[in-house]
Amino acid sequence: EVVILGIDNDQRCVKTLQAELDSRNKHKQYWTALHTTFEEAVNTLFGYLAKDGKRIAPLFFFIDPFGYSGFKMETLKRILKHPRTELFVNLMTYDISRFLTADHASESLEQLFGTRSFADASDLTGDKRVARVVGLYCRQLQHAAGAEFVQRFRINTPGQGTRPKYFLIHGSKHLKALKVMKDAMKKRSTQSFRFEAIGLDPSRQLDLFEPSSEEKLCEQIYAYLCGYSKKDIPYEEIEAWAY
């Protein structure tokens, strides 16, 4: 059985989503759209499960916000306390970069990152600012929220070269979750390391994976092994680090 809970704070979106779920729910499973906020829904759900001592089934959270507020790092930490949970976050880097220094956005950005360190990117511009923001968010998912594996997927703006439109960030606590997500995203591509958005012709494909040099990867692996204290390193350990 697969349970789907769709969450939106806009009643019109809830009605549209519920109609879509109903049209696809062939096996009459529990698929429903709720009119609430992500924060309220998550805290209510985990509060209920903790109170009754229920065993938590595997959970996959796709967080697709309008903007950059409403999904605090502290809330993601609560989700990732459970071993069989995954996060897939649409990080709207354009909006974040645009309002990085705005006073009205300061509190929301601090909640988003779980730190004030986002301000360190204030003096940067363009790709450098975006790279700093994404890097900080990924590190915070690991160090503040408790994800063991984090993978970013860059989606570029159609017709604007490598200018990122947003980043999809996957966080989990198990290597298998990372493998399945990375392999699944790659299978959606018609070319190596590319993603074709629905409704766009092949000439307007969106980049899925950031370019990766094999030579650079070899150098990174060599540096990792040279700095290792053990004489023998299990292959699984190297795979988990490099994947």
Residue map of PLM features:
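Class I S-adenosyl-L-methionine-dependent methyltransferase catalytic core
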Residues: E1-Y243
